[in-house]
C-alpha cells in the first residue's frame, strides 16, 4: 500500500490490518522512512517489544502527543524532517568548550 510507505505531513492516518506481531513489524519497517510510528494496545509487554523493533525515531503509544523539544527526536532511514526539533539536536549546531582557571 503506497500511502503506508510515503512520508506524509498532514492529517493522514494509515491503519492496516495484520495477523500477528511479525507481520505488523514487517509492514511498519517496509518503508524508506521512519520518523513516527504509533502503537495502540493495552498490553505494555507487547508494546515494549514492538517499540524496540520498529525502525522509527519516535514511537507513540496510545496517544497523539507530539512531545516537546526537551525530548530527543530524530528520524530513521531517509527521514530528515524533525531531526532538528529537539534540544538534543542543538548539539549538532554547537561546540562545547570548558576553560578552567585557577586563581591564586
Residue ranges and their predicted role:
Residues 1-104:
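Conserved C-terminal structural/oligomerization subdomain of aldehyde/semialdehyde dehydrogenase
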